[in-house]
Swiss-Prot record:
The lineage of its organism: Eukaryota, Metazoa, Cnidaria, Anthozoa, Hexacorallia. It comes from Zoanthus sp. (Green polyp). Belongs to the GFP family. There is a cross-link at N66-G68 (5-imidazolinone (Asn-Gly)). This is GFP-like fluorescent chromoprotein FP506. Keywords: Chromophore, Luminescence, Photoprotein. Pfam families: GFP (PF01353). The modification 2,3-didehydrotyrosine is found at Y67. Fluorescent proteins have become a useful and ubiquitous tool for making chimeric proteins, where they function as a fluorescent protein tag. Typically they tolerate N- and C-terminal fusion to a broad variety of proteins. They have been expressed in most known cell types and are used as a noninvasive fluorescent marker in living cells and organisms. They enable a wide range of applications where they have functioned as a cell lineage tracer, reporter of gene expression, or as a measure of protein-protein interactions. One of its GO terms (biological process) is bioluminescence.
Length: 231
């Protein structure tokens, strides 16, 4: 399959590993999937290999896996694609999650491309505290994230991008739980060109695929970058 100058192909495999701890409960999750960098689509299968079953809603982790890899975003030609341009060396990100019920999470990830394997590796660490025992996350009353739009803000002097988005967890009772995401994306190599500010719309979808032995789920994402629709 033909590669771009960044070691990316039209279709790539992905391997994920997350180590985490939420309110004292430690866990390890691994996953594999297929992604289409230039179509902005990806799909992964995840499995809790240590610490399962999780005593909280796995939806809080979804944004660290799929929304966690911005290489799989469809970019128009008139916007510089910072994420693909960072490959094959890749990039890192650090993110804070502030939930409206008082819970706080932090996550960081390291993303690299193996040109030889045509594979993208995603290693992350996730920590969460202060989830109310009677809240929707600990009671597992969530049902995916509502589609969202992240504003991407360049910081040229530092060679980084900042991401700002309020996302909403859909609840099984019909309600919503708001979470503020603040992210810093940093390429491992010095960016040759920085993008202007822009938006990334993304939709995450989780499907439970657990069996008698392991907690498993399937995640898909579609992400598209754009400028303002207003002059």
């Amino acid at each position: 399959m033909a590669q771009s100058k960044h070691g990316l192909t039209k279709e790539m495999t992905m391997k994920y590993r997350m180590e985490g701890c939420v309110d004292g409960h430690k866990f390890v999750i691994t996953g594999e999937g297929i992604g289409y960098p230039f179509k902005g689509k990806q799909a992964i299968n995840l499995c809790v290999v240590e610490g399962g079953p999780l005593p909280f809603a796995e939806d809080i982790l979804s944004a660290a896996f799929n929304y966690g890899n911005r290489v799989f975003t469809e970019y128009p030609q008139d916007i510089v694609d910072y994420f693909k341009n960072s490959c094959p060396a890749g990039y890192t990100w650090d993110r804070s999650f502030l939930f409206e019920d008082g819970a706080v999470c932090i996550c960081n990830a390291d993303i690299t491309v193996s040109v030889e394997e045509n594979c993208m590796y995603h290693e992350s660490k996730f920590y969460g505290v202060n989830f109310p025992a009677d809240g929707p996350v600990m009671k597992k009353m969530t049902d995916n994230w509502e589609p969202s739009c992240e504003k991407i803000i360049p910081v040229p002097k530092q060679g980084i991008l900042k991401g700002d988005v309020s996302m909403y967890l859909l609840l099984k009772d019909g309600g919503r739980l708001r979470c503020q995401f603040d992210t810093v994306y940093k390429a491992k190599s010095v960016p040759r060109k920085m993008p202007d500010w822009h938006f990334i719309q993304h939709k995450l979808t989780r499907e439970d695929r657990s069996d008698a032995k392991n907690q498993k789920w399937h995640l898909t994402e579609h992400a598209i970058a754009s400028g303002s629709a207003l002059p």
